[in-house]
């Protein structure tokens, strides 16, 4: 079998869901429940994740050319020290497959991310157990998300202004009678740092932008 495009997921205000934490956001996304984030304007100091201008559905081979560029998203209104959890799910699949996943993300300010497999059990998608090797409990960390109210402040040059990149591979579980159904769920937890101590009146925006490309080889 050949490696084929499966799906591109991007930050937006329709398919991304909020939660009190990453686990709840992931459950909400997997089951299309809860509330969606707000779009926020790009702040001047933020980079922007964008496709090439000619990467469109009109090209001979552009598997994700019809997917719009990602939005900057947040749970408005933003506040100092605020932490917001987001998640998005893939389409449902059943056939055992080898998957390749490529993630690129930026957040103001600190973020954690996790990629998990969910399975439809009874009437609900829940986190699959055990998780396939390559997903498991690996938590991606950028910045220091856990201490904003203890004094982490934005200082120049801002040490959080990096675009983060990650990739992984995994094999989905066996499905001999074709009754099992799965989803890939990407979740984030993003923290807005406190304003710079010597410039307390400066604006303190918050936002998340991401793309995740998924390819697979059906076994």
Where are these regions (language model features)?
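Beta-strand-rich recognition domains
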Residues: 1-115, 140-219
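Local beta-strand/beta-hairpin segments that build beta-sheet-rich folds
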Residues: 126-146
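Short, surface-exposed beta-strand/strand-loop-strand elements in extracellular ectodomains
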Residues: 110-132
């Amino acid at each position: 079998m050949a490696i084929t495009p499966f799906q591109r997921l991007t930050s937006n205000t329709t398919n991304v869901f909020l939660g009190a934490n990453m686990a709840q956001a992931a459950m909400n996304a997997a089951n299309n429940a809860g509330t969606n984030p707000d779009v926020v304007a790009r702040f001047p100091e933020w980079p922007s994740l964008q496709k090439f201008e000619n990467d469109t559905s009109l090209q001979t081979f552009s598997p994700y050319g019809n997917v719009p560029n990602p939005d900057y998203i947040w749970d408005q209104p933003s506040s100092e020290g605020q932490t917001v959890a987001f998640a998005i799910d893939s389409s449902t699949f059943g056939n055992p497959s080898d998957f390749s996943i490529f993630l690129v993300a930026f957040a103001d300010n600190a973020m954690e991310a996790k990629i998990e497999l969910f399975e439809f059990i009874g009437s609900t998608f829940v986190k699959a157990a055990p998780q396939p090797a390559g997903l498991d409990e690996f938590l991606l960390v950028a910045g220091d998300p856990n201490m904003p109210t203890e004094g982490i402040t934005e200082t120049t040059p801002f040490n959080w202004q990096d675009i983060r990149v990650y990739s992984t591979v995994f094999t989905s579980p066996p499905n001999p009678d074709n009754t099992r159904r799965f989803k890939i769920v990407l979740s984030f937890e993003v923290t807005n740092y406190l304003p710079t101590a010597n410039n307390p009146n400066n604006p303190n925006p918050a936002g998340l932008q991401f793309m995740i490309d998924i390819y697979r080889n059906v076994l």
